[in-house]
Amino acid sequence: MRDVHVHFLHGYCGGYTQEFFEGFITAAQRVGLDEIYLLEHTHHFREFESIYAPIIAYNDYQHDWIKRNMDGSIEDYLTFIDTVKENTYPIKVKFGLEVCYIPETADKLADILAEYDFDFLTGSVHWIDGWGFDHPKQKEIWRSMDVNKVYRRYYDIMCDLCESGLFTGLAHPDSIKCFGCTPAYDLTDSYHKLALLLCKYGMYAENSGGLRLNYDPKLELGMNRQLLDVFRQNGVTIYTASDAHKQIDTGANIRELERMLNEVTG
């Protein structure tokens, strides 16, 4: 089993240490994982500040949130990776980034990413035309939005993400359901278009437990069944992902997420 989305969070702001890293190995072995993908989010690194210009400008909350979280340098992360890779471990470990895809700054993003060589790059959509739709403190903004338009824009951005050719994988492909808002139209065409692009660009998609783990334990686990079925019909590679933001959550829900995939193919 593998967990392809485990946040390192630079030692929970305590710095990059071998001891803290090995805690992830222990946590992964405890739940029977064979492989983990450790990553950092681009909003933690000052080198990526320019891609967040539309986010920072959207409102005061997002300005303050980005400025507060962008507290590190990617160079420290790269040095840490080089050090850790000098040793061997009982499970496979890959290192990468979760990268916010923001269409308005996609060219800048491509230039920045070209400077680095990671094992993987996971693309994610957390912002729709500047708005952080999945931030709990901005949940009320949904009330003023046309849900159908938001969903269409979300999947348009996700398709652009794939067509950028920058990414190895796609994070939580239906995280837009985080607050229970659903569109009035059939998403089948959007799902098929996304599936075809994932295959065309050789990307995997996550079957993610992140919403249940990080938002509400009552939320649906993993992709909705319709999306999962469409991905399977089109031959999309799907990997299980916890979206753990705490070391102890490494591998959370992975067995159940894996069973979902087996049920679809069985």
Positions of predicted regions on the chain:
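Non-cysteine beta-strand/loop elements that form the S-adenosyl-L-methionine
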Residues: I36-L39, F118-D129, T168-A171, E206
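Charged catalytic cores and adjacent phosphate/nucleic-acid-binding surfaces used
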Residues: M1-G11, E47, S144, D160, ...
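Short amphipathic alpha-helices and their capping/turn segments at secondary-structure boundaries
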Residues: F21-D34, E104-D119, R153-L166, S190-C199, ...
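Active-site glycine- and acidic-residue-rich loops that bind
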Residues: V93-D107, R143-D156, K177-D189, K218
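An N-terminally biased module of ancient metal coordination in phosphate/nucleic-acid-related enzymes
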Residues: M1-P103, F179, Y185-D189, K193-L194, ...
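Short, well-ordered coil/turn segments that N-cap beta-strands
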Residues: R2, G32-E35, Y89-F95, Y116-D119, ...
